[in-house]
C-alpha cells in the first residue's frame, strides 16, 4: 500500500466527527401541507469503477481422503464442491442450464450493470486472463490494459493457494489426510471460508449479487481500491467513510473459473459530484370540506433535489438517496434534470417559471408522513389523531386538517390505529404561514383523481367545470323566466276575464233590479188612478 493510501486509512480511522457537520433546516409550508428539509450536501454517482478479482485455487487430489473421517478430509470435500459449483455457474460451462439463467438475469438488468457484464465477458477469454496473470506476476495489484483498450484494476488473492501449496499439501503427502495438526486445519478452514461464501453468494444469485459483501471484497481491499480511484482526496475521504453505502450500491459479477483461478468483477459506484446543496420535499394530503363534499390535493413533486451543473438533479422518490454524515448519496441513473426555478413551487405553486405538479382527489385520507425532524399529519373524517410524549402520554388531539408536528417534546403520533415514531434528528424548524391552497377550490367543481398534473391544468379543468355550471344556471334561469312570463300572462288574462264576468253579472243584476223596481212603481201608480165601484143589492 502506497503512503497516500495509508494516510487515507488513518484519516478515516481517527476522524470520528461527521465529515460534513451541517445544520439542517426544515420548513413547513402551511399553504401546501409540505416540508422542505435542507442542509445536505451531495454525493452523486456519475460512473462505475471496475476491479477484476482473482482468487487463486489449487488442484488437490482428494481421492486418497475419501476413506478418511478426519476434519481435514471433510474440509477438503467442501472446498472441492465449492469449486465445482463455481465452475457450473461460470459462463465457461456452455452446456449448463444455470448459465442461461445467469446470462438472462444479467442481461435483463439494464444499463446499471452493462459495463460490469461486458467486462466479465471479456475476461472470460484465456488471452485476457493471461494478460492479467502476467501483470500481477510480481504483485497482487496492478492496472491492466485489455485487448479491447479498456484499463482495469486487477487484484489477486493468493493466500488460500499459498497455504495449500506450501503448508497443507506437504503434510497430506506425508500422512495422507490424517493430519493431526489442528492449527493447520483451523487455518485452512479460515482461508477456505471466503471461497465458500463467495460460492454460496454467486450460487444463490445466479452469478450476480446486488451488493458487495466483505467476502467478495474485504475492507482492506475496498480501501485500497478507493485509494487508487482517479478522484480528489476529499471524494476518497467521503467514500471511505461510507463503505457500507459503497457496498450496498455495488455489484459482483461472476466471470470464469479455470484450473487455478476464480475470476469475478467488482463494480463499485464512483461518486463524481460532491458538496453541492441538496434538499428533500415531503408532502401530505390537504382537504377542504363543504357539506360532506371534499376537495383534496397533494404536491406531486416529492423527492430529492441536488444542484448539478447549473440545473437540478431530481430524484422522484425520497428513498432514492441514502444519507450518511450529512451527505445525500444518490444514483444519477435514477434522476431527472429540472430547472432551478422548480424550487419556487415551495412558496408559489402558481409561478409562471415552472409547472408545479399536484395530485387531486375527492376522497379524504387520514395518514402521516414522517419528515427528518417531525411529521406531517392529515387528519379527516372520524379518525382520532393524537400527539404523544413517552413520559406525559397524549399531549394533543388534532382537529381536522393538515398539521406539522415537530419532534421537539414529541415521541410519536397516532392516526387511527397506526403509530408513527418520530426521528430525533436535531435542526431548525420553521413554519411558513399561508392560507391552505385547497381552500380556494369548491368541492363541487374540483376534479377527481388527477395524478402528477400541472396546477394550471387543474385550474383549466376547474374553469371548464365552472363554465358548465354557469351555462346550466343560465339555462335554468332562462327557463324560469319563461315560466314566470307565461304565468304572468295567464294571471292577467284570468283577471281580465274575471273582471268582465263580474261586470256582466253586475249589469244583469242591475237590469233585473231596475225591472223589479219599475214594476213596483207602475203598480202603485195604477192603484191610485182607478175609482172605487159601489155594488147594489
UniProtKB/Swiss-Prot annotation:
Residues 120-174, 444-479 form a coiled coil. Residues 1-21 form the signal peptide. Residues 516-537 are cytoplasmic. It comes from the Viruses. Glycans are attached at residue 463. Disulfide bonds join 33-402, 65-177, 278-306, 287-296, 321-330, 345-356, 379-385. GO terms for cellular component: host cell Golgi membrane; host cell plasma membrane; membrane; viral envelope; virion membrane. Residues 102-122 are annotated as: Fusion peptide. It holds the Pfam family Fusion_gly. Residues 26-486 are extracellular. The chain crosses the membrane at residues 487-515. GO terms for biological process: entry receptor-mediated virion attachment to host cell; fusion of virus membrane with host plasma membrane; symbiont entry into host cell. Keywords: Cleavage on pair of basic residues, Coiled coil, Disulfide bond, Fusion of virus membrane with host cell membrane, Fusion of virus membrane with host membrane, Glycoprotein, Host cell membrane, Host Golgi apparatus, Host membrane, Host-virus interaction, Membrane, Signal, Transmembrane, Transmembrane helix, Viral attachment to host cell, Viral attachment to host entry receptor, Viral envelope protein, Viral penetration into host cytoplasm, Virion, Virus entry into host cell. InterPro entries: Fusion_F0_Paramyxovir. The record marks 101-102 as: Cleavage. Belongs to the paramyxoviruses fusion glycoprotein family. This is Fusion glycoprotein F0. It comes from Murine pneumonia virus (strain 15) (MPV). The gene is F.
